Regions:
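Short acidic, glycine/serine/threonine-rich loops at helix termini
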Residues: 1-3, 25-31, 102-104, 179-180, ...
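Internal gly/pro-rich beta-alpha loop/helix module
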Residues: 1-79
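Short, ordered loop/turn segments at secondary-structure junctions
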Residues: 18-22, 120-123, 138, 172-173
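Phosphate-binding active sites in nucleotide-utilizing proteins
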Residues: 79-80, 87-151, 155-160
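C-terminal and late-domain segments of enzyme folds
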Residues: 82-85, 97-116, 201-204, 208-229
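Cysteine-nucleophile active-site neighborhood
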Residues: 140-221
Length: 229
């Protein structure tokens, strides 16, 4: 029926993907589970390819895609750098912090940064020659006990950030910098303590959408009292 409706509307059906238990992927708050957590992930992809070869007109999809107009754009500002020296950026990366953005990392490298990865779970300290540190997202609440027990890393995080070097923390990384983080077991674990507060799991979805904030001091991405959305 869907095909007939599409044809009546002048839309050419390109295919479909049937419901298939072998293609099911578990989800979690914030999205799907990581590829490294899925058993037989490669086999699922192979099965998906086999299914789509039978139910999707791949040649028609490619032909249609080639008719799309080229997107013309200009960057609003070319940041660039005149610095001849190398800047070392330490990025948290492990089971707890797995939401990394390749484009951002490539941008940093193209602008004179040397990327150094460290694990808040397994390593004892942030690389000593770091000029800046980034804590991106992930699921620290799933590893709250392990993160809390790594006292030497927490001490290093406090020392480095208190020294005044640039630090960016978002999502799970932002939670890690709080005084306490509620784990998936419902217990509250001591964290880095940079931010005086507790990060807890709400019982329902809080909100999506934009917020307006007014910075009370200058920062890397803001000016004091200049509203942001």
């Amino acid at each position: 029926y869907a095909k007939e409706c599409a044809l009546k509307l002048g839309v050419q059906p390109l295919g479909y993907i049937p419901s298939d238990s072998l293609l099911h992927i578990e989800s979690r708050h914030l999205g799907l589970v990581g590829a490294d957590e899925i058993k037989s992930f490669d086999e699922k992809l192979e099965h998906l390819a086999d299914v789509m070869e039978k139910t999707v007109d791949i040649d028609a999809v490619i032909k249609l895609a080639k008719t799309a107009e080229k997107i013309e754009y200009e960057a609003e500002k070319d940041v660039g750098t005149d610095s001849k020296s190398c800047v070392n950026i330490a990025i948290a990366k492990d089971e707890a912090f797995c939401f990394l953005y390749d484009d951002n990392i490539a941008f940093l490298e193209e602008n004179g940064c040397r990327i150094m990865y460290f694990s808040p779970i397994h390593d004892s300290e942030i690389p000593h020659d770091a000029d800046g540190v980034i804590f991106w997202g992930g699921y620290p609440e799933r590893y709250a006990k392990e993160l809390s027990e790594n006292k030497s890393m927490i001490k290093s995080v406090k020392k480095v950030i208190d020294s005044g070097i640039a630090c960016i923390a978002e999502c799970g990384g932002f939670l890690y910098l709080h005084s306490y983080l509620e784990g998936t077991d419902g217990k509250k674990y001591p964290m880095a303590g940079i931010i005086d507060g507790e990060a807890v799991n709400g019982k329902r979805l809080q909100r999506f959408g934009y917020m307006e904030v007014t910075p009370v001091s200058d920062g890397m991405a803001c000016k004091c009292m200049q509203p942001l959305k």
